[in-house]
């Protein structure tokens, strides 16, 4: 590497890692404050339990006083005298003080008194943080930026100067702690904690942003705008099939929604699965769950025959054989982009894939006397060949190869995909993991949020700390995948979804199809208040705000264009638009647009049992794929021991790649087995073939010692001999 290239690499390294470090610092601050707030709240709750007897006594005294007051009817005796006769004034005052000190408002989730004890810890790092992090604000974030700058300038000032602290945005609960009612002085410790809570929240919404940051940067600057938007606008409109005229764009959507209503109403009497019932005086739709689709005897026989015919194989041989067909290991290139290839590189790549995907490390794979499996060589190749870029390219090659197999196309055409999360406990300390008692107990973990195509292949995945708002990452996952399969309908399991997500999917030409656990909680929306939708009239009173859509239409198109061209991160944009349940005006407009697609989807979901079955079938494919991934990722009790995001992404990317290799190998050998059965005179039902799955692994040796030597007869691409029994084939 010459001097100019070396300097360029160093400058690029410094810039990128400065950006990453800034993002990590904010992530750590967010995690620290979240943990601190939770810890102090739990501590206060324990303290309240310890004093429950005092609280009970005080509450009983107040009860006696209230009963006396309510039952008092003697006009000759003052009510206060009657109360004090029952409960002495001194005891009553003490009871009020106890209740005041031991209780808190129902909407208070912070233990303020406990929290302020950690002010000294905060001040140890806060001045340096404020010096290194350069915050800027959108108009909505200016009050919070003023509070940040005030603490930055006056953190160690006298109490007098704190009287001038900006208090815009201070809510009722914080106000009681921050500002003394009598003296109007500001508690600098409470103010600092309030400011930090607001800053972190504003950074999530992008009301505040960090100059030069990737995750917390200024989203407005990333969107297409000005002359750049005008120049590219015709291409965006053409590719997304929208008109710049909002009225022209909405006209066909109105017709489609009206037609969906009428079709649902007309078919209502022939749809026994859907009913309207009354709960607590309100009408709600109820939907009978789908019954399990039974397997026919011929399907069970076919599955058994195919499984018996598949050859037994070690996982390394499977990977090497798939490489013979596809050449996917050629996508693992040296980081320097050098074109020279070292001897027996596929064997080394294969060993590294197994070490990562099976979560067993290098030790079980190192073999003395085999240069390709020497520890030093494996470590060197891991450092220079294994990275997100090469894993993605190798995975793309597998997906593309699999999509050309006839059997894969009998399962689906690639137009549909499902998204779901695979949870991993992370016993190591990591800022890139998060809590969730349901999945991780008292520890932390990550979610590998990934896509499964209708051909059973995995398309793309993202690592999410903990399990936070999986649906936020859905659109990002869709837009980042670049295989030959381009699904247009994305199905997800029951999870939180919003009108904004429906709207963004609709703008970009995708159908968002979540499985609904409680369809009765969903609302139906309409354009025309006078339209007669029969039995659905009481349930479709909400009107779509066309005026908002018309007013913000070009900005909505600009957002869609920016997303489609990867100018802006979809997850960050959705967070900014939603603003913790208080969407921006543009977010509201996109949400109104999303109500069109959501209502149309809900009506189809209610009206068509086959559509509901299709969603369930695809989601089951994703769950079955996750079961295979669990079987492969067997080492270290299935726990992920990667502390850094890059390591987590690389290891789980390797897992997805190995699972795809298993799918490719199984599909090709299943094709061969089906052809043998046809050649022997068996009549095969296409409906049964469509219900086969390439996710079986009983014939694959995943656990144990491995062989990296391919039999001579298959080195040139031939298939292994099938292991079938004559009597079973002749049935």
Feature map (PLM): residue ranges:
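Catalytic or ion-translocation cores adjacent to nucleophile or general acid/base/metal-coordination motifs
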Residues: 368-406, 436-554
